[in-house]
């Protein structure tokens, strides 16, 4: 209120005869029956709105009403075209205006010098509004977006207003909305939502203010030259641009408003782009479960090892003879381990300068050259892979010892491991694990599988070309690729062939079988041996007949139902986990010899298979 300047202004002198402004006091209170005390305030509009308002002054008032009503009122478009009506806004009561103004000033406070710079602009806006509204005294409109429900009346002036004191022909604006329009705070909506249609009720002050401030950035884009459809749409969404009271503002406030809305729209668009492409620094639900699907399951000694791509399985190129002897290489490595300087190493080994000794050491350990040195090969990689499980256990023991030293308490490695497990499941980001970890693990897993497949194809091609058995490295890589093999404790190594499934490399499916099915000739001999054993067991009266017959029957039954191995998986696993039957002494020499030979062959087949 202090921004009103009571000094003489030539722009005010010509219109003081119709309405005399009173100099307001500092503690003036708005009263609905004393509008002469209230100072009409102004709003800030964009420069494009100001130009269009000056160009659109000669337009008729009916078109003004048709363009303003859909923006401010809940009227369908059909009703606005046929029955243009005049709207009248009731004055806000005293108890509702004060908290709104106080909340607006507390939330969005504009510096006081900002208003002092614009006293002259406010006076000019007041006089221009008064001049425009004076020729049309019966078409007054009071704009106030603090009132949620507006009043639609057929008469231009309500009876309550005719009985009260004559009000000035000045559009009333709520002063509390100016800082909200001028503030540079972003819109509360996280995503740019479409503008609400005119049929939707505007019952909230926040929705009306948001929609009122949203089109600030879109008015410059549309421009003055619009088509008919674009004008209807803009009338529905953003209201009239060239009608109503004069919308004049300085260029500084226009640029602030436009930059605010443009920045807000840009930030919301960037947020939408980030939400479409999943950010890596955000952790989504079920991260530990998804991480378990990517990482190899323990024991880590059975995890697939990526073969070295640089190692060529074909014929290697001929290497040139080195000028360093193997003795010099060993001396260089040993002296470097002892901490000798390069000058001393060069003098002792006699290789020449210290640069030659340093370069030779780097070639030996693989730091330079074509990386074909024997410092690190696939054998070392496999050896390190076998140490992972034991190293994991030792790691937790070391953590437990260090924790006991620092806290003077007694913890076990199991307690430390369980506590870390709980902390990791609560917040994986505290361990540096996020979505980027899963993405990198998936890439590494795909690369390992692709490399193993390529190496297997190369091995098959070389085997088919040379008709020679594959080398040990490729066999080891093939065995490491079998991820579905179950872990078997070494103490059950005697029964490993009964518990381990046979890998079907063609289809990748596992078939659970107790023993390999015998050929037809051997099956016939088994039937003969079964008859002999029946005779022997009946003569001895032993109790092992039913057990031996049951095991042979299970073997025949598995041979008959080999096409459906998964149906009898549990039954065969129970039967195959039994220890081999004891040797039966027989009185018949031929039958006992055949039984003993058969059992020895079966035991050799069981024990000769490799576990690792």
From Swiss-Prot:
Segments of skewed composition (Low complexity): 1-18, 47-68, 94-106, 115-141, 182-203, 218-228, 254-272, 585-606
Renumbered residue ranges of the record's region Disordered: 1-20, 46-68, 94-143, 179-273, 443-480, 497-527, 546-612
Feature: compositional bias, Basic residues: 555-571
Function: Surface antigen mediating adhesion and aggregation in S.cerevisiae.
Keyword set, alphabetical order: Cell adhesion
Basic and acidic residues composition bias: residue spans: 443-457
GO BP terms, alphabetized: adhesion of symbiont to host; cell adhesion; cell-cell adhesion; filamentous growth; regulation of DNA-templated transcription
Protein name: Adherence factor
Gene it is expressed from: ADF1
Biased composition (Polar residues): 230-240, 465-480, 497-512
